[in-house]
């Protein structure tokens, strides 16, 4: 640890070769001092420089890569660990475009054992979409990490703030700021927040089930925001409404007939419906309960599953339903068993019954559709589930989950990194999905769960 006689706080940048340590050093120092290239191990010596972070002078150390198979690796590793021991704070940099290997984790834990005043810095997260990759590094066991992109100057400001807080240097010195420091503060200004997304909702169903009536009922009071856009009567029609601060765009798709009856222009309509669903987040499946369900209803419902959409079942014409409530619900549960997670709303579009409930349910389902499970909590639930019902063996060989990571949302997508991913049986996957639904309430939301070995995860 840093000794009391030192006047400057010291920050060491550690990590394996070619993860961006020297680039981060140059970014913080605002000068190209260390050699940077795509060739692993270009930094052999420890580069030192006094720099100013938001007006505070600190000493920054850039170390050689700690790769196991590098030349002079033992000497470099020993030098790095000594630098770690003498520093006040360590920035351990990893490559966010790669899945961590066992060697990554082993080296990090060795550094952390030497000096627990350590930040895990995940570099090369160049845009918001790539943030999903960072969750693979939950296996390092750090409660907080920092996603940055040195080349795009993303996340640097937040990292600097955290560094100053950790070093108890969190009060910016206002006097005697020179031009370079002012420039640094400007360059590291926080990034603008992304604009809130419009919820895209596709209305699907057979012909004459009441899709257009539902659209009219949903947009009756708010349709002045966006006027109807239609090329022909078989084109999807867009309408946007505002619920509180949330915009919702509805797409009324063309009604779908039996395939044998789809000819000419209706084939075009089906293609347009497919394209409309490709950009949708949620599907409203409209079912006509004035008569029994038909096979085509089930086939149309598979469109939502095909496009991995959130889904809400709308039972229209409820005022003239063909059977009592209990009978219809029992039939619905039997015929649409694969949509048991979908909420069901009864309505009469012509009488505007339960229309507000549909609007608010869309927002609720979208929140579930966009949900991200905290990585530590996700792994805790998966661990408990596998302990409660252990994974079946694979020909007498142990099957285990190393860790789980949610790598995407809309819909939630989770990878299980396993020693034998092909041994994950469909029934056990369903058990894990049901467990996650029970714990985290993924209402109306498909959950995608896949199994990978470490090598496959690394390649992705």
From Swiss-Prot:
Domain EngA-type G stretches: 9-171, 199-370
UniProt similarity note: Belongs to the TRAFAC class TrmE-Era-EngA-EngB-Septin-like GTPase superfamily. EngA (Der) GTPase family.
GO molecular function, one term: ribosome binding
Biological process annotations from GO: ribosome biogenesis
NCBIfam families: GTPase_EngA, small_GTP
InterPro entries registered for this protein in UniProt: G_ENGA (IPR031166), GTP-bd (IPR006073), GTPase_Der (IPR016484), KH_dom-like (IPR032859), KH_dom-like_a/b (IPR015946), P-loop_NTPase (IPR027417), Small_GTP-bd (IPR005225)
Domain KH-like: 371-455
Residues annotated as binding GTP 2: 205-212, 252-256, 316-319
Protein name per its UniProtKB record: GTPase Der
Chain residues that bind GTP 1: 15-22, 62-66, 123-126
Swiss-Prot/TrEMBL keywords: GTP-binding, Nucleotide-binding, Repeat, Ribosome biogenesis
Subunit structure: Associates with the 50S ribosomal subunit.
Recorded superkingdom: Bacteria
Gene name of the record: der
Main function: GTPase that plays an essential role in the late steps of ribosome biogenesis.
SUPFAM superfamilies: P-loop containing nucleoside triphosphate hydrolases (SSF52540)
